[in-house]
């Protein structure tokens, strides 16, 4: 029973949960990951990893080389690519480059990563297999720090010394422990589509515009249309697109923040009509139109942010819960830093646990919570505010984009 009590229970097998589990496992600290979904769940879209996030992970995994990450997660890894992006913002009605950094001499610092591949790569970065138990949907938490119990809907009960909430923006753990913390809905419309092309069609329709970049970002008059490579092989290319814009008044029929999950997979006729009025340039024009979109898998995404105060974090810690990832710092996907801070959360929390365990032989859980939040709280909450502000700036009027572009040209 004593050994079981020292086990750390991780709720959620996303990036943050798996990072924490992998680092704990590599250091011989017992832990179990519980995931509500089945092993075949898919989150195959791509995210941007920045140096501050992946460098900390590589170091914590034993100073793995940058090339190991690229070979494991880059969307174009199967054709020898490196997940490179040009970081350019283009006028999606003309194709003109509005803003672009000078990348001629700089080293690659941003890596585009397939989310599924990243999860698998993290899970595989060690000799011992992670203990991930799927089909475990959390029902409630009992106990306090040092002696907690997780109760699941399948009637399973597990005891441990600490619960790590890695269960996302709609965290079940957070809703029980901190019911006052409710995700803030951002008043923006966001639709996401997925489709595939033969490699030959990709080379003809998209490659002339994107060249070697794994994402082609188009910005318009208060709306965005990024095209992104999710996975690419010698014969097939899996891509996705996003269409996001600011809300137009109180009766905007496309603004549906509380749409049921099944309805969120249906394509509203109003979206098809709106896409056909955008007057897009190629390559966006070929894919973001009513006829093409009908053949894609389309999802309505509600953009939400989560803020947690230091007092809330301390209160949760007293009840045996520590937060990582979107459960406590959800931020916008486009222009956000969420995946990077999820990695940092896992690295920093694991380090706090490992340090405490090595110093005392068993975890001093009060110190673990204190030391983790001592740095992670400000870092992550600042990132939520910064990412939200950036998200709105990326939906600015076309006139402002033109002004920015002209100023860049004058400086150059």
From Swiss-Prot:
GO terms for molecular function: monooxygenase activity. Its cofactor is FAD. Belongs to the paxM FAD-dependent monooxygenase family. It comes from Arthroderma benhamiae (strain ATCC MYA-4681 / CBS 112371) (Trichophyton mentagrophytes). Pathway: Secondary metabolite biosynthesis. Coiled coil: none annotated. The gene is nscC. Its EC number is 1.-.-.-. Keywords: FAD, Flavoprotein, Glycoprotein, Monooxygenase, Oxidoreductase, Signal. FAD-dependent monooxygenase; part of the gene cluster that mediates the biosynthesis of neosartoricin B, a prenylated anthracenone that probably exhibits T-cell antiproliferative activity, suggestive of a physiological role as an immunosuppressive agent. The non-reducing polyketide synthase nscA probably synthesizes and cyclizes the decaketide backbone. The hydrolase nscB then mediates the product release through hydrolysis followed by spontaneous decarboxylation. The prenyltransferase nscD catalyzes the addition of the dimethylallyl group to the aromatic C5. Glycans are attached at residues 92, 170, 231. It is an enzyme of class 1 (oxidoreductase). This is FAD-dependent monooxygenase nscC. Residues 1-21 form the signal peptide. InterPro entries: FAD/NAD-bd_sf (IPR036188). FAD binds at residues 35, 46, 119, 326, 339.
């Amino acid at each position: 029973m004593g050994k079981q009590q020292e086990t750390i229970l991780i709720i959620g097998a996303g990036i943050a949960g798996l990072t924490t589990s992998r680092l704990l496992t590599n250091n011989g600290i017992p832990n179990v990951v519980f995931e509500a979904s089945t092993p075949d769940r898919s989150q195959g879209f791509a995210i941007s990893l920045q140096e501050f996030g992946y460098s900390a992970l590589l170091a914590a995994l034993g100073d793995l080389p940058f090339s190991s990450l690229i070979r494991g997660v880059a969307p174009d890894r199967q054709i020898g690519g490196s997940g490179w992006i040009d970081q350019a913002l283009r006028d999606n009605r003309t194709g003109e480059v509005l803003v672009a950094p000078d990348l001629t001499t700089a080293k690659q610092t941003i890596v585009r990563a397939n989310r599924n591949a990243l999860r698998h790569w993290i899970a595989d970065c060690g000799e011992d297999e992670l203990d991930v138990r799927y089909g475990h949907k959390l029902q409630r938490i009992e106990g306090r720090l040092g002696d907690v119990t997780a109760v699941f809907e399948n009637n399973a009960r597990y005891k441990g010394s600490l619960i790590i909430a890695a269960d996302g923006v709609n965290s079940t753990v957070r809703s029980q422990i901190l019911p006052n913390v409710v995700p803030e809905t951002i008043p923006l419309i966001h639709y996401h589509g997925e489709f595939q092309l033969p490699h030959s069609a990709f080379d003809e329709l998209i490659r002339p515009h994107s060249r070697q970049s794994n994402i082609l970002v188009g910005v318009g008059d208060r709306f965005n249309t990024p095209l992104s490579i999710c996975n690419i092989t010698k014969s097939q290319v899996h891509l996705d697109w996003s269409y996001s814009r600011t809300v137009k008044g109180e009766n905007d029929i496309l603004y549906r923040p509380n749409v049921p999950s099944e309805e969120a997979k249906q394509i509203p006729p109003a979206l098809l009509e709106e896409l056909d009025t955008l007057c897009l340039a190629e390559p966006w024009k070929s894919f973001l139109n009513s006829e093409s979109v009908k053949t894609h898998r389309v999802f309505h995404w509600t953009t939400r942010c989560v803020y947690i105060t230091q007092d809330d974090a301390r209160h949760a810690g007293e009840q045996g819960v520590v937060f990582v990832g979107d459960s406590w710092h959800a931020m916008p996907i486009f222009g956000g830093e969420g995946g990077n801070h999820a990695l940092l959360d896992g690295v920093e929390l694991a380090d706090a646990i490992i340090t405490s365990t090595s110093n005392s032989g068993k975890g001093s859980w009060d110190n673990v919570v204190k030391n983790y939040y001592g740095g992670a709280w400000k870092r992550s909450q600042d990132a939520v505010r910064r990412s939200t502000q950036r998200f709105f700036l990326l939906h600015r009027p076309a006139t402002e984009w033109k002004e920015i572009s002209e100023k860049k040209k004058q400086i150059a």
